[in-house]
A protein has these predicted regions:
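A residue-level detector for the "anchor" residue at the start of short, highly conserved motifs
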Residues: 2-226
């Protein structure tokens, strides 16, 4: 299996904190003791709190994951990630982070409460099926009804983008290919990408991105798209 983890269940709950990690280029799934399932993206890390399923259904994410949560109104499922808190209200949703501190949440069904925990008592924003929320620089921006099948394509082994910021693409390439996409032109760096990849080599991905941006693309050995 692609996932590396240490788990100890006791009486239907976690006896100790557990960490699940996926290597670059490989995704995997795990079922939590409450019946919720998680698809963990490549190069990602999920920490499950000790005592999970004993009134405390909290996890911490670095990277990206898709959560299919078994609803329990008395014990909400909470994801912590880069200063963000995503609280389930009976939901399936994805969470993705990037190196710029951006946390993006896409809801496929149900409702989540999304808030910035670095802002003290900031009120949560409610996201419903089809909604997208992005936390960056202390601000949560919401777009309603914009989530599509492309947002979850990575759970099926495909990277699909529609007007995606390059920071999101860069984070995915680190996780899936272990490469660093460098955009040395400030104007190009502000552009977005619409493209999809399945089974492409790192060199092919770089060339497609370079063409889409109207730039010269160097292969992974050179480490840049200029």
């Amino acid at each position: 299996t692609a996932m590396v983890g240490l788990a100890q269940w006791r009486g239907g709950m976690t006896a100790t904190e557990q960490v699940y990690a996926t290597p670059v280029g490989q995704r995997d799934s795990v079922m939590l003791p409450d019946g919720s399932t998680v698809v963990l993206a490549p190069g990602s890390r999920l920490t499950v709190a000790s005592g999970f399923n004993d009134g405390n259904r909290a996890v911490t994410l670095e990277g990206a994951a898709f959560f299919e949560v078994k609803h329990d109104g008395a014990h909400p499922f909470v994801v912590h990630s880069r200063g963000a808190e995503i609280r389930d209200i009976g939901t399936a949703f994805s969470v993705k982070t990037d190196a710029n501190g951006r946390v993006a949440v896409a809801v496929t069904h149900g409702i989540v409460a999304f808030r910035d925990t670095t802002a003290g008592s900031a009120a949560p924003v409610e996201l419903r099926a089809g909604d997208r929320g992005v936390l960056q620089a202390g601000t949560v921006a919401v777009t309603r009804g914009t989530v599509t099948a492309e947002d979850m394509a990575w759970t099926r082994g495909q990277l699909a983008y529609r007007d995606a910021p390059l920071a999101e693409v860069q984070a995915d390439l680190r996780r899936w290919y272990g490469i660093e996409l460098q955009v040395t032109d400030a104007v190009l760096a502000q552009r977005t990408l619409t493209a999809s990849f399945r089974g492409d080599s790192a060199a092919q991905v770089i060339q497609v991105i370079a063409l889409a941006l109207g730039a010269f693309g160097a292969g992974p050995a050179e480490g840049a798209a200029k």
